[in-house]
Amino acid sequence: MVQQLSLYSVIDEGSFDLLIATISALSGRSPVLFANYNHVAHPNPNYAIEKVNAKNQLVEQTRVQLMQEIPFEKLQTEEYSYKLCTKMTGDGPPIETEYLNSLMRSCGDGTRPWSLSLWDIPSAGKDRKVCTQAVVESVVTSTGGAHSSILSFLAELGYVPGYQFVQLGTQFYLENGIVFQISKLWALHGESGKTSAVTKDGFLIKAYLNVPKATDLESINQGTAHLQQLKRELRDYLELSIPDRKSMDSRVGHLNDF
């Protein structure tokens, strides 16, 4: 089970170029464009699911998140660098709506793989220096059947569609293992084609790194120190902080939606 250590912040659109220049100068590296489609599903309420395990311990139902990378050729732009982020000012992402609507129903050998993950609620405590969250992740490379899709795969697992969003932005891969993301998010409202900007007039900032084992305290402490050092280096530009852990709770019945 991977432990993800992270810090978050936000900036307005006018601060984007300065932040890119700052991180480029600190790291000596160039930003990389990325785009992904995300679908969050929840357990089917029509199923009578036991809420205790074999040891009679309470087990809470959890949402699952599916993520698929969006190929750059699907972006409605001729700019395939971080500069695209400065042009994303509307209520919808620069991606074909028809393509986004088809992703959950696509099937066949040409379908791109999906990342399937479960996120635990972040660790509690007054003295936390970073957000620490356990993540279980797998890859769905294909689904069986003549008319299979990721939707039918979820249904067989006992899950039904929840909500969808698109994330598009740029990221730096820092030498100490930290991934520094600057991105925009859009919520997708079914197959109507309607979208709404979650990060309107600004960008979400996330700095994170993954530790393969929760028992590797040395790596966790080292990762925490790296994130704290980055926080100090950027204190004149933005405030990296720990979000409210309740907003990152993926358990059913807890606030976690847009």
UniProtKB/Swiss-Prot annotation:
Keywords: Activator, Nucleus, Transcription, Transcription regulation
Gene Ontology terms: biological process: positive regulation of transcription initiation by RNA polymerase II
Chief location: nucleus
Protein's cellular compartments: Nucleus
A GO molecular function held by the record: transcription coregulator activity
Entry's Gene Ontology cellular component terms: core mediator complex; mediator complex
Alphabetized PANTHER family for the sequence: MEDIATOR OF RNA POLYMERASE II TRANSCRIPTION SUBUNIT 18, MEDIATOR OF RNA POLYMERASE II TRANSCRIPTION, SUBUNIT 18
Family per record: Belongs to the Mediator complex subunit 18 family.
Subunit structure: Component of the Mediator complex.
Reported function: Component of the Mediator complex, a coactivator involved in the regulated transcription of nearly all RNA polymerase II-dependent genes. Mediator functions as a bridge to convey information from gene-specific regulatory proteins to the basal RNA polymerase II transcription machinery. Mediator is recruited to promoters by direct interactions with regulatory proteins and serves as a scaffold for the assembly of a functional preinitiation complex with RNA polymerase II and the general transcription factors.
Name this protein carries in UniProt: Mediator of RNA polymerase II transcription subunit 18
UniProt source species: Eremothecium gossypii (strain ATCC 10895 / CBS 109.51 / FGSC 9923 / NRRL Y-1056)
Upper classification of the organism: Eukaryota, Fungi, Dikarya, Ascomycota, Saccharomycotina
